[in-house]
């Protein structure tokens, strides 16, 4: 229970007093479940009024319940990507001011998620919200897998915690989104696979660019992963990919 309390205390704004427990990473999927349930509920409740408003409230709720920590991470990563001199990267991450790169990156990531979700029908939207949250948390955590700390801080602490059960954590964060995807349409299953592929490419590019990983970069990759998945999910849904139910129905009717 200490790990669960620690996970909710660290990753959400829920007022739970808890010290940083070494097992909190194992409970991150439960945080994702809470976030996804909240966002999906708001989405369903408001969808009949306005798809755009439902999407805005849903996406914003996740950012807010996470304490806007990842908003800061996306902005810092955006600013850092604009710096050519590696010796100044730490200075940029520790600077509280947000530059043009940070503003653009934050707007891009947020609007990509918002526009993609607001263009979906209700069924696809619900599944996409849920899977996007699990994928976001999974990608953020898997970013720590065999990564070198960029410098000492929260990121290096989490990398050390992840290394203690590296293989188990990686299996956990890969399997959960895949299992959830199998319960949905074929288009969403393909979207999850493509999102993971793009995640691997992005992680490699980030490590090549910065030489390591810190908390902000892990948070940025998680949020970018959410937006990319929602975009892919929309594209796949509109490309008339048959659902698993449709495929089974056609097979049964042909017998």
Swiss-Prot record:
One Gene Ontology CC term in the entry: plasma membrane
Transmembrane stretches, start-end: 24-44, 45-65, 98-118, 122-142, 164-184, 187-207
Family statement drawn from the similarity comment of this UniProt entry: Belongs to the CobS family.
Cofactor(s) annotated in UniProt: Mg(2+)
Subcellular location as annotated: Cell membrane
Functional pathway: Cofactor biosynthesis; adenosylcobalamin biosynthesis; adenosylcobalamin from cob(II)yrinate a,c-diamide: step 7/7
Membrane topology: Multi-pass membrane protein
The species this protein was found in: Thermoplasma acidophilum (strain ATCC 25905 / DSM 1728 / JCM 9062 / NBRC 15155 / AMRC-C165)
UniProt key word Transmembrane helix: yes
Catalysed reactions listed for this entry: alpha-ribazole + adenosylcob(III)inamide-GDP = adenosylcob(III)alamin + GMP + H(+); alpha-ribazole 5'-phosphate + adenosylcob(III)inamide-GDP = adenosylcob(III)alamin 5'-phosphate + GMP + H(+)
GO molecular function, one term: adenosylcobinamide-GDP ribazoletransferase activity
Protein name: Adenosylcobinamide-GDP ribazoletransferase
Top-level class of the enzyme under EC nomenclature: transferase
Biological processes per GO annotation: cobalamin biosynthetic process
NCBIfam families in alphabetical order: cobS
Cited InterPro entries: CobS (IPR003805)
EC numbers: 2.7.8.26
Function in brief: Joins adenosylcobinamide-GDP and alpha-ribazole to generate adenosylcobalamin (Ado-cobalamin). Also synthesizes adenosylcobalamin 5'-phosphate from adenosylcobinamide-GDP and alpha-ribazole 5'-phosphate.
Domain of life: Archaea
UniProt entry keywords in alphabetical sequence: Cell membrane, Cobalamin biosynthesis, Magnesium, Membrane, Transferase, Transmembrane, Transmembrane helix
Pfam families for this protein: CobS
This protein's record includes keyword Transferase: yes
């Amino acid at each position: 229970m200490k790990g669960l309390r620690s996970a909710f205390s660290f990753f959400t704004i829920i007022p739970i007093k808890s010290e940083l427990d070494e097992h909190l990473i194992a409970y991150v999927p439960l945080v994702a479940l809470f976030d996804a349930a909240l966002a999906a509920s708001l989405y369903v409740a408001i969808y009949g009024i306005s798809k755009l408003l439902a999407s805005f409230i849903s996406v914003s709720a996740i950012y807010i319940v996470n304490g806007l920590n990842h908003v800061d991470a996306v902005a810092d990563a955006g600013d850092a990507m604009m710096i050519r001199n590696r010796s100044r990267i730490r200075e940029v991450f520790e600077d509280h001011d947000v530059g043009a790169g940070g503003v653009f990156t934050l707007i891009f990531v947020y609007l990509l998620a918002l526009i993609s979700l607001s263009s979906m029908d209700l069924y696809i939207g619900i599944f996409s919200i849920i899977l996007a949250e699990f994928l976001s948390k999974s990608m953020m955590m898997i970013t720590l897998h065999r990564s070198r700390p960029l410098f000492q801080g929260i990121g290096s602490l989490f990398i050390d915690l992840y290394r203690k059960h590296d293989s188990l954590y990686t299996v956990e964060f890969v399997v959960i989104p895949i299992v959830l995807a199998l319960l949905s349409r074929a288009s969403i299953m393909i979207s999850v696979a493509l999102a993971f592929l793009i995640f691997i490419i992005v992680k490699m590019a980030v490590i090549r660019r910065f030489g390591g990983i810190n908390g902000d970069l892990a948070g940025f990759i998680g949020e970018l992963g959410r937006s990319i998945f929602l975009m892919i999910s929309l594209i796949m849904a509109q490309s008339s990919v048959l659902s698993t139910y449709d495929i089974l129905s056609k097979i049964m009717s042909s017998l």
